[in-house]
């Protein structure tokens, strides 16, 4: 299977807008800060950040979980992926993803180390999205 065929899973009807589902637990980086950073990255790439997801469409999923070791160090787990989100009863959410569309890290360190890993993983997933949905040479959506 070639790369183009596998990337069809992450293609969107309207690739110029994307929802980012962001979940942060007990970390030195807040949901609000991470959301602002991700939305700024999207806007720089001319992608409109959506405030609501359309179930069944590709979204950028970011989950960052931390446990404080002391006042300046955390153990962290980061998962960033292109995923299809499906809302179930109440607040339940099902997340479908493919392994090759997942980026992330496990580690222990300060806020700066966590931020570096978040930036790297978000950039990797976002580039995969752009490559699947746009012809990056002329800057137009794929036909």
Predicted regions and their residues:
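Alpha-helix initiation/capping motif
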Residues: 30, 51, 107-110
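Short acidic low-complexity segments
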Residues: 47-58
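Solvent-exposed loop and beta-edge segments used for protein-protein assembly and interaction
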Residues: 12-14, 54-56, 70-72
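A structural "domain/chain start" motif
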Residues: 1-36, 131-143
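Amphipathic beta-strand/beta-sheet edge segments enriched in Tyr/Trp
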Residues: 58-141
């Amino acid at each position: 299977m070639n790369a183009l065929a596998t990337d069809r899973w992450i293609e969107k009807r309207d690739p110029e807008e994307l929802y980012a589902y962001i979940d942060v637990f007990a970390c030195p980086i807040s949901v609000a800060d991470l959301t602002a950073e991700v939305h700024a990255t999207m806007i720089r790439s001319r992608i409109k950040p959506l405030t609501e997801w359309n179930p069944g469409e590709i979204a950028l999923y970011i989950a960052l979980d931390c446990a404080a070791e002391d006042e300046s160090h955390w153990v962290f787990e980061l998962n960033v992926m292109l995923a299809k989100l499906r809302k179930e009863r109440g607040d339940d959410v099902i997340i479908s993803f493919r392994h090759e569309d997942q980026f992330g890290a496990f580690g222990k360190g300060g806020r700066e180390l966590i931020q570096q890993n978040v930036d790297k993983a978000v950039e990797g997933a976002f580039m995969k999205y752009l490559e699947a949905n746009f012809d990056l040479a002329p800057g137009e959506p794929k036909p």
